[in-house]
């Protein structure tokens, strides 16, 4: 049996789903271990690709203080012993961590049971857990690490199917990540009338916390907008879109890349180690995206960018920047290393 562990946010969970799909193609149904917190249940409770799903009461350690940090560590340690016993009982051959605090019990449980641990780091800057565990991993996968045995990001094949050659801006997507982004929502509200006058269709993923505000805003303006809080069918949304304005979580960066959607990235300013900035900077350095800091966000500059962007060449180059099949390449390494 193979275990996939990790989660908390959509970026981690999208990797888990992509790897699960690749294992399924090899007639393997992994066990999934996540957390009772975050979005893990929303994504995977009852998901048919996994043989079984287990959600443990673990929380992050980094943002805790004092006794809260000790309590969080204690929970992780207890659940690590639970995972160790489960792995031994099930005859687990390998554990694949996709990062996030939800991965801690399973990853430590694997080391305690002397089961090969494989880690995928999604961001340009290693997370603290992944940095701690990297020396003990059988293999460490990262699109930003020159020593990674597989360098392409594990994007689901659905996003490659969402590719089409874009030649002009007909539909603009505001994408704030799985939890939404107030700064991106505010920008959308500011430039929506201008977009409407230009005849540009608007798709807006605003997050649950801002859904009612967004509904009221667009109703007041009487402008047609495809508005939603969150979707599991982002590939279909990307297929409709010509250009995106988005956060720079690694999942979003590489899914937009696979679908060939040119983007303006506005990194979340409080992301650990500023990793969202560096996720997008890798593409910006190749001339494949535009990057604006949130505190320097200017609607007039955004309008100017939208008027000047060379959609056709960037769309084609983005799609060529990432190869499909990375999930299969990763599970091939996992299966070989677990023998």
What residue spans do the PLM features occupy?
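Active-site-proximal region of nucleotide-activated glycan assembly enzymes
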Residues: 28-29, 50-51, 111-161
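Donor-nucleotide binding loops and adjacent catalytic segments primarily
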Residues: 38-49, 166-243, 277-280, 285, ...
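An amphipathic, basic-hydrophobic alpha-helix
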Residues: 65-94
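A short, well-ordered alpha-helix in the C-terminal region of glycosyltransferases
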Residues: 312-324
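Acidic donor-binding loop of glycosyltransferase active sites
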Residues: 92-94, 239-252, 261-262
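Conserved nucleotide-sugar phosphate-binding/catalytic loop shared by glycosyltransferases and other
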Residues: 4-7, 26-74, 210, 293-295
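Short amphipathic alpha-helix
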Residues: 12-23
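Conserved donor-binding/catalytic loop of nucleotide-activated donor transferases
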Residues: 113, 239-241, 255-266, 286
């Amino acid at each position: 049996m193979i275990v996939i562990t990790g989660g908390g946010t959509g970026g981690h969970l999208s990797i888990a789903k992509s790897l699960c799909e690749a294992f399924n193609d090899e007639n393997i149904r992994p066990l999934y271990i996540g957390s009772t917190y975050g979005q893990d249940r929303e994504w995977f409770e009852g998901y048919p690709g996994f043989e079984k799903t287990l959600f443990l009461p673990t929380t992050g350690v980094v943002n805790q203080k004092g006794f809260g940090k000790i309590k969080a560590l204690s929970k992780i340690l207890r659940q690590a012993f639970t995972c160790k016993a489960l792995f031994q009982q099930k005859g687990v051959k390998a554990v694949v961590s996709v990062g996030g605090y939800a991965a801690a019990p399973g990853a430590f449980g694997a080391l305690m049971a002397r089961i090969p641990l494989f880690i995928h780091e999604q961001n340009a800057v290693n997370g603290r857990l992944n940095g701690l565990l990297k020396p003990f991993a059988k293999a460490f996968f990262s699109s930003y690490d020159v020593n990674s045995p597989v360098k392409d990001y594990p994007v689901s094949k659905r996003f490659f199917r969402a590719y089409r050659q874009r030649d002009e801006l007909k539909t603009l997507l505001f994408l704030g990540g799985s939890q939404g982004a107030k700064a991106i929502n505010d920008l959308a509200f500011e430039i929506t009338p201008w977009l409407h006058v230009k005849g540009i269709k608007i798709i807006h993923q605003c997050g649950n916390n801002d859904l009612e505000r967004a509904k009221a805003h667009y109703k007041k303006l009487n402008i047609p907008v495809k508005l939603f809080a969150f979707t599991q069918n982002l590939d279909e949304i990307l297929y409709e879109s010509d250009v995106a304005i988005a956060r720079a979580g690694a999942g979003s960066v590489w899914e937009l890349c696979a679908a060939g959607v040119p983007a303006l990235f506005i990194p979340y300013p409080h992301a650990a180690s500023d990793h969202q900035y560096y996720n997008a900077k890798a593409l910006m350095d190749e001339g494949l995206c535009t990057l604006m800091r949130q505190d320097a966000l200017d609607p007039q500059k955004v309008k100017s960018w939208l008027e000047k962007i060379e959609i056709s060449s960037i769309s084609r180059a983005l799609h060529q920047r990432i190869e499909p099949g990375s999930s299969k390449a990763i599970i091939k390494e996992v299966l070989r290393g677990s023998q």
